[in-house]
Amino acid sequence: MGDVLVTLKILPKDTDADIKSIEDQVKRNIEGLCSINRMDEVDIGFGLKYIKLEIIVQDKEGEIDRVENSISSIEGVGEISTENVSLI
């Protein structure tokens, strides 16, 4: 099986959330589950930000769900959505 490039959008639970802290926790939580291709803070407007995360996972059933579940367990994370999935 090949690998898949997945783009995730991680929204904080509230506007006061510490984005840098969430980024650090994401890195720790997903270590060993996937590799990080890119992680950026994106401004929505009016001080609101989200994390755009590109990861590479194995093309196996349930891999993306495992990563999403690991991220959603982080305090301060509100919503996670998968924006793009590409076979590489």
Swiss-Prot record:
Gene Ontology MF terms: translation elongation factor activity
Superkingdom classification of source: Archaea
InterPro entries cross-referenced by the UniProt entry: eEF-1beta-like_sf, EF1B_bsu/dsu_GNE, Transl_elong_EF1B/ribsomal_bS6, Transl_elong_EF1B_B_arc
CDD domains: EF1B
Signal peptide bounds: none
Alphabetically ordered keywords of this record: Elongation factor, Protein biosynthesis
The UniProt record lists the keyword Amino-acid biosynthesis: no
HAMAP family: EF1_beta (MF_00043)
Protein purpose: Promotes the exchange of GDP for GTP in EF-1-alpha/GDP, thus allowing the regeneration of EF-1-alpha/GTP that could then be used to form the ternary complex EF-1-alpha/GTP/AAtRNA.
Entry similarity comment: Belongs to the EF-1-beta/EF-1-delta family.
UniProt-listed NCBIfam families: aEF-1_beta (TIGR00489), PRK00435.1 (NF001670)
Protein name (database record): Elongation factor 1-beta
Organism in which the protein naturally occurs: Thermoplasma acidophilum (strain ATCC 25905 / DSM 1728 / JCM 9062 / NBRC 15155 / AMRC-C165)
Higher taxonomy: Archaea, Methanobacteriati, Thermoplasmatota, Thermoplasmata, Thermoplasmatales
